[in-house]
């Protein structure tokens, strides 16, 4: 494929934008470098770049675009919002409608509040949990990404009984010491951390199904035990459902798994492609939020009509009968096709697939936590990513990211993708 215009634009972007991108995940650093493709437009399941190349898209903007690009129902809602004014700074009737839709879909959301992003939603749930419990420390799980605010840019110390250390320049040591990080799916480490820090732990923050070191499900009984132990300790449980809400069913991963948290943070899908976040939970906890309580949260753009109307339209599309069954069918088809191609060419892969989301790890071993994901072959994934791009398949440029199937993907798209995988695996073996 010709990418000359993408290269020209990236060279120009480097002169004006830090690193040439507005989020480091777009830089291709995770796949060994190379020029990121600049897209011109998107429609349905397809991307079209500035050089005229067409791609089947599984990036889905890192998750929000579950209905495909430029879905007509969502486009109509956004157009209506633009015509009537995109920002008021006052209440609107639409935010009531949307709040009711979220509550009906995820019953643990007894009250909700809108924010501008998933990062803001997670950040605020932690603040509210601290206000409710009067405690300061947070337990989180290694490799789970919760946004780019200081408190969650923290990695594990030497073990569950040690304090966290900064995972980014600019995060202070004192901030990192408010966080204890333990391995996902490791109940023994979680118990140890809870025992050591006990009455200092305000909340446990967890992705109920991990989406940020690939798609990783909780082991049987893990989330149930986390809930039970946290509550016995007087700590709250916060689910970060920024990736998972409405991903696996019309509702949250908590509905899908049958394990209910005290607070939930959401984003991505619920905006229909526009920036949004939301959080909610038990009434007695949510009443700690201003103006009813002492935990402050605000935002100029929070609940803006454009994002709210886009979100309403997105949820309306997701109510289509049989949609999530189709996601499951296509996800299973992809997993099966990738595994058969890998076996044919003698390439070791593990595919973690949950409904319409999956991750392809270059390893023969199961992946159930961040350390196991980190041990997979990134060099092979980088070659695979670039090979798939040349075959017209757009993936996320990191071995840790997921593929997302949208309502716009067809069975023909899935079959074409499987053929591309077979072709790329063949070339990878030949190149060796």
Curated annotation (Swiss-Prot):
Signal peptide: none annotated. Its EC number is 5.4.3.8. The lineage of its organism: Bacteria, Bacillati, Bacillota, Bacilli, Bacillales. It is found in: Cytoplasm. Belongs to the class-III pyridoxal-phosphate-dependent aminotransferase family. HemL subfamily. Keywords: Cytoplasm, Isomerase, Porphyrin biosynthesis, Pyridoxal phosphate. HAMAP family: HemL_aminotrans_3 (MF_00375). Coiled coil: none annotated. It is an enzyme of class 5 (isomerase). Its cofactor is pyridoxal 5'-phosphate. GO terms for molecular function: glutamate-1-semialdehyde 2,1-aminomutase activity; pyridoxal phosphate binding; transaminase activity. The gene is hemL2. The keyword Isomerase applies. One of its GO terms (cellular component) is cytoplasm. It comes from Listeria monocytogenes serotype 4b (strain CLIP80459). PANTHER family: GLUTAMATE-1-SEMIALDEHYDE 2,1-AMINOMUTASE, GLUTAMATE-1-SEMIALDEHYDE 2,1-AMINOMUTASE 2. The modification N6-(pyridoxal phosphate)lysine is found at residue 268. Pathway: Porphyrin-containing compound metabolism; protoporphyrin-IX biosynthesis; 5-aminolevulinate from L-glutamyl-tRNA(Glu): step 2/2. GO terms for biological process: protoporphyrinogen IX biosynthetic process. Pfam families: Aminotran_3. Homodimer. It catalyses: (S)-4-amino-5-oxopentanoate = 5-aminolevulinate. This is Glutamate-1-semialdehyde 2,1-aminomutase 2. InterPro entries: 4pyrrol_synth_GluAld_NH2Trfase (IPR004639), Aminotrans_3 (IPR005814), Aminotrans_3_PPA_site (IPR049704), PyrdxlP-dep_Trfase (IPR015424), PyrdxlP-dep_Trfase_major (IPR015421), PyrdxlP-dep_Trfase_small (IPR015422).
